[in-house]
UniProtKB/Swiss-Prot annotation:
Domain of life: Bacteria
Protein name from the UniProt record: GMP synthase [glutamine-hydrolyzing]
Keywords in alphabetical order: ATP-binding, Glutamine amidotransferase, GMP biosynthesis, Ligase, Nucleotide-binding, Purine biosynthesis
Pathway note: Purine metabolism; GMP biosynthesis; GMP from XMP (L-Gln route): step 1/1
Subunit organization: Homodimer.
UniProt function note: Catalyzes the synthesis of GMP from XMP.
EC number: 6.3.5.2
HAMAP family for the chain: GMP_synthase
Residues reported in the UniProt entry to bind ATP: 228-234
Length: 515
């Protein structure tokens, strides 16, 4: 984790396993205040050495009274710092100070109406009623001594509490999730109103610190960069190239799972445009042989991740002195793969598929950033908009957009349909409004009629979502006439397709990718 210069105010977030914990840090950074996520096992002395302005306890999937419950160093409460407990964090604080936590009659998940009963600093200038996002199975049923009820909801009589004399605050809901309509304001009240932070964190600070960190880590050694042409790997390549110049060699692996025209575009942009040393490896046959007959999505991801590293290993053996491998791993990649405390949603290609005998040391300069921060970073580095605003594309590529076994025919269907979708979205001027859009092949066939003949062909799914950081997302309301054009074109122009469906599921409960 990057430690910035002492003049920057910092809020520490302790990780108790919530899938939303990175969002807390993200929200705080949006306010211009630096925030770091640390494991709940961090000691009070370690926190004191960081000189933070305040601490936030994240939520988590455990019960504070259950076996294996996660706790923190009790001396943290003696530091005299403001503490804000969210969900599990509030329950932990309650238990620590002698209150009561019990299992709820039923798990509460979704939107709820919060009623503010006591206007503590946390609720300053906020409406008395507001919609919040609940996700919990336990409740605080008895307040600790010195605490008062700040807020209630229909199913949660103690939805918020505080002990303002000690600057201790807790909420049962998740203000960091955008479904909580005044969540940002509530966190802002803690950061500025309670902790007294000042703005000072920005991407220029990040670049300054990260360049220094890369140079210090690499020294006179050489780095291989896994270049795909997507936003993340492009920013990594340019950032590292800025730090160490020709000590960087980019390897572009064409695994046969790329979008239409992608391979040619990558070579033109980085080899010719940025004057980087880019080695292209044609590994289509190698990947397809490994993936033959494989249907399980987790197995596919790990095979693709392993093969990537082995390809790099093979290429590195042909080069001299390659010690480091650079990857575009983001905060969101890590949280979706599960931390020591978070439950795994799915293994990520940058963090879940690495072989144990890997010969490289990893450099992941973006692993403290969210996608929108990466785009800002890319712009600061002078990367053209067409790359900075390129569609997010997973490392396994079309391999996880073909559900089940991958074949050349299925890949071609996804590749061509995706190209049509992207073309029409850009034509409609929606490419900056929609966070991510792509087609997927669920593998099911259905009956249709084309040219007075019966067909039995594939269904193509369209996925398009709006989001800020990829941690939560809503399905995009694409105009019907645009959807109609996309549907007509795909059915008419892509062989073996006779039906189009549109995914209208948000995240959560679904993830953005289908596998």
């Amino acid at each position: 984790m990057i430690i910035l210069k002492k003049q920057h105010d910092t809020i520490i977030v302790l990780d108790f396993g919530s899938q939303y914990n990175q969002l807390i840090a993200r929200r705080i950074r949006e306010f211009g205040v630096y925030s770091e996520l640390h494991p709940h096992t961090i000691t009070a002395e370690e926190i004191k050495a960081m000189n933070p302005k305040g601490i936030i306890f994240s939520g988590g999937p455990n019960s504070v009274y259950g076996e294996g419950a996660l706790h923190c160093d009790e001396k943290i409460f003696d530091l005299g710092l403001p503490i804000f407990g969210i969900c599990y964090g509030m329950q932990l604080m309650t238990q620590q100070f002698g209150g009561t936590v019990e299992r709820a009659n039923h798990r509460e998940y979704g939107k709820a109406v919060l009623k503010v009963e006591n206007e503590s600093k946390l609720y300053a200038n906020l409406p008395e009623e507001q919609v919040v996002w609940m996700s919990h199975g336990d409740l605080v049923t008895g307040l600790p001594e010195g605490f008062v009820v700040d807020a209630t909801s229909e199913s949660c009589p103690i939805a918020g509490m505080s002990n303002e004399a000690k600057n201790l605050y807790g909420v049962q809901f998740h203000p960091e999730v955008r479904h909580s309509e005044h969540g940002n304001d509530l966190i802002k009240n803690f950061v500025f109103g309670v902790c007294g932070c000042s703005e000072g964190w920005n991407m220029e600070n990040f670049i300054e610190v990260e360049l220094e960190k890369i140079r210090e880590t690499v020294g006179d050694k050489k780095v291989l960069c896994a270049l795909s042409g997507g936003v993340d790997s492009s920013v990594v390549a340019v950032l590292i190239h800025k730090a160490i110049g020709d000590q960087l060699t980019c390897i572009f692996v064409d695994h046969g799972l790329l979008r239409k025209g992608e391979a040619e575009g990558v070579m033109k942009t980085f080899s010719e445009g940025f004057h980087m040393n880019v080695i292209k490896v044609d590994a289509k046959e190698r990947f397809m042989n490994k993936l033959k007959g494989v249907e399980d999505p987790e197995q596919k991801r790990k095979i693709i991740g392993n093969e990537f590293i082995y390809v790099f290993d093979d290429e590195a053996s042909k080069l001299e002195g390659m010690d480091f491998l650079a990857q575009g791993t983001l905060y969101t990649d890590i949280v979706e793969s599960g931390t020591a405390t978070a439950q795994t949603i799915k293994s990520h290609h940058n963090v879940g598929g690495l072989p144990e005998d890997m010969q490289f040391k990893l450099i992941e300069p973006l692993n403290t950033l969210f996608k929108d921060e990466v785009r800002v970073l890319g712009s600061e580095l002078g990367i053209p908009d067409e790359i900075v605003w390129r569609q997010p594309f997973p490392g396994p590529g079309l391999g996880i957009r073909v559900l089940g076994e991958i074949t050349e025919e299925k890949l071609e269907i996804v590749r061509e349909s995706d190209a049509i979708l992207r073309e029409e979205i850009i034509k409609a001027g929606l490419d900056r409004e929609i966070w991510q859009y792509f087609t997927a092949l669920p593998g099911m066939r259905s009956v249709g009629v084309m040219g007075d003949e019966r067909t039995y062909d594939y269904t193509v799914g369209i996925r398009a979502v709006t989001s800020i950081d990829g941690m939560t997302a809503d399905w995009a309301r694409i105009p019907w006439d645009v959807l109609e054009k996309i549907s007509v074109r795909i059915v008419n122009e892509v062989k073996h397709v006779n039906r189009i469906v549109y995914d209208v599921t948000s995240k959560p409960p679904a993830t953005i990718e289908w596998e």
